Amino acid sequence: MSWKALTILLVFSSTQATASCRWSRAALFPAAHRPKRSLSLPLNPVLQTSLEEVELLYELLLAEIEISPDLEISIKDEELASLRKALSFHSICNNIIPKRIPDIRRLSANLANHPGILKKEDFERITLTLAYTAYRTALSEGHQKDIWAQSLISLFQALRHDLMRSSSPAVSS
């Protein structure tokens, strides 16, 4: 093999590795890395950075949530909805997590092929997607309920698989 061919091969493989690293960064939730210009949402936002914020997230999830016909998620409790983290919750739920069956199935397929342990922000978004899917499953009827339930099961299995991987002794050492 000539040195020119070897050089081209090395450059090509380096380009492939660089491109795949950049792609995998946003593969699960590409919208988190492409915020809309009209939003004041930071790039790749995260809700939970402390125990208090985890408790607030549970409070937001337990509050009465409303989903409009255009799939816009809002919190009915005005006091909770006025909090700064509730605004982040609203932005993440309405601009980042998938809300249509094909998008949720795509996320499940990407999770099945995801190497390693999920990042904190990806785990958080998958959990929010799981909560959204459970909510839609409860509201649906007939064949639609079965489709939403299957999506719910797929997401749950992916999260469980990630938790099992992250708690195994080989990973934690």
Curated annotation (Swiss-Prot):
Entry keyword Signal: yes
Superkingdom in the source lineage: Eukaryota
Principal cellular location given in the protein's record: secreted
Any Gene Ontology CC annotation: extracellular region
Residues annotated as signal peptide: 1-17
Keyword field: Secreted, Signal
Short name of any one Pfam family annotated for the protein: FAM180
Subcellular localization: Secreted
Family to which the UniProt record says this protein belongs: Belongs to the FAM180 family.
Protein name per its UniProtKB record: Protein FAM180A
Native organism: Mus musculus
